[in-house]
Amino acid sequence: MKLPAYIDMPFQEWKTSFSFFNKVSVRFSETDMFGHMNNVTPFIYFEEVRISYFKKLNMMSENKQTMTVVASQQCDYLRQVMPYEELRIYVKTSAVGSSSLTLHYLGENLEGEPCFTGAVVMVQVSKESGKAVSWTDEEKETLLHTR
């Protein structure tokens, strides 16, 4: 299997570097006319697991003056996923810049077979101005040590 550019190590090593995940069941409404999972569905799963991950890290609060926004994202599809399949959607921090963050994703079935992978670059911005805001040292430490 040809690896996407964002996976910079052997796939099995990359796969075992994840620990945080959500379980999902593919709903019939998430399929297309060909009977398999629609190509936009992984992005919904990525968003859901990302929110759970940020909550676990205590990085989401309505009182916080900043928020993270998606700058770019991609998904690479490895196998068909059918309605009602059970999946684990993993997320981990790959890199942290001054105000940016790269997350990696892995969607696999319960047999451990990878179904899709993904990456997203997010930027922390001020809720008021919309301008980029640097991560604090504490935030960087939290993000980098919770893979």
UniProtKB/Swiss-Prot annotation:
GO terms for molecular function: fatty acyl-CoA hydrolase activity. It comes from the Bacteria. Pfam families: 4HBT_2. InterPro entries: 4-hydroxybenzoyl-CoA_TE, HotDog_dom_sf. PANTHER family: 4-HYDROXYBENZOYL-COA THIOESTERASE FAMILY MEMBER, LONG-CHAIN ACYL-COA THIOESTERASE FADM. This is Uncharacterized protein YsmA. It comes from Bacillus subtilis (strain 168). The lineage of its organism: Bacteria, Bacillati, Bacillota, Bacilli, Bacillales.
